[in-house]
Amino acid sequence: MKPQNLKVPFFWEERSTEIKDNVLYIPNHYFKHDQFIMPSWEEFFGNNNPISCELCSGNGDWVVSQAQNMPQMNWIAVEKRFDRVRKIWSKMHNFQVSNLRIVCGEAQTFFRHYLKNEILQRIVVNFPDPWPKSRHRKHRLFQDEFMNDVVRVLVESGILVLATDDKNYLVEAIKMMRQCLLPTIEDPYYCKVLDNYGDSWFERLWRSKGQEIFYTEFVKKVGI
């Protein structure tokens, strides 16, 4: 399958949430989420295996590799850019990865409207846009509302991982995580090598430019 074989299943004027070809489409500037009847994830995957989720999936190298290496785990790749979703979808088909599903849409919207409580074993946020300028802070993924949803959708002892090349973004994200989750890494709560992390296109890109990569990992506290 080539990336261009995947087509958006609606015209913009008639946009709505849809599932087609193992992709959940959540359109931008769309607010009728409650009108969509979301199937259970057991139905969507065809099994009741535990579920992990990658946010900011890019071209899909990392999540496809993870799904291949962990066939006992179901994976959700969340990416808002359709050109990148096409590449993930192409890899999923060409490598016959049956335990991967794709969400084409904003991570915040997906978490808020399409995930039930305590559904995810692991959330990995790979190199989110840091939006470094102060006037753009509202666009950052790590906000109070997002963290509330992270805690809600993680199972007990579920894990949240962030990988980033932006030290300032890392520090701010850690402050937010510490308010509701427990760090698994000692103070200063991040490391430069994370065991079993895997390999991603963005990681290779930033390392090739001489950038340091930082990882942090938090676990859901008992009773949250």
From Swiss-Prot:
The positions flagged as active site in the entry are D129
Q: Which Pfam families match?
A: Methyltransf_4 (PF02390)
Which UniProt keywords are given for this protein, alphabetically ordered?
Answer: Methyltransferase, S-adenosyl-L-methionine, Transferase, tRNA processing
**Taxonomy, superkingdom:** Bacteria
Quick one: which pathway? Answer: tRNA modification; N(7)-methylguanine-tRNA biosynthesis
- InterPro entries per the record? SAM-dependent_MTases_sf, tRNA_(Gua-N-7)_MeTrfase_Trmb, tRNA_methyltr_TrmB_bact
Kindly list the positions annotated as binding substrate: K133, D165
Q: Where does S-adenosyl-L-methionine bind?
A: E54, E79, E106, D129
Q: Which reaction does it catalyse?
A: guanosine(46) in tRNA + S-adenosyl-L-methionine = N(7)-methylguanosine(46) in tRNA + S-adenosyl-L-homocysteine
Recall the GO molecular function terms of this protein's record.
Answer: tRNA (guanine(46)-N7)-methyltransferase activity
Enzyme nomenclature, EC number: 2.1.1.33
Q: Which cellular component terms (GO) are annotated to the entry? A: tRNA methyltransferase complex
Q: Which family does it belong to?
A: Belongs to the class I-like SAM-binding methyltransferase superfamily. TrmB family.
Q: PANTHER family recorded for this chain?
A: 3-DEOXY-D-MANNO-OCTULOSONIC-ACID TRANSFERASE/TRNA GUANINE-N 7 - -METHYLTRANSFERASE (PTHR23417), PENTACOTRIPEPTIDE-REPEAT REGION OF PRORP DOMAIN-CONTAINING PROTEIN (PTHR23417:SF14)
Which NCBIfam families does this entry report, sorted A to Z? Answer: tRNA (guanosine(46)-N7)-methyltransferase TrmB
Reported function: Catalyzes the formation of N(7)-methylguanine at position 46 (m7G46) in tRNA.
* Name listed for the protein in its UniProt record: tRNA (guanine-N(7)-)-methyltransferase
What's the name of its gene?
trmB
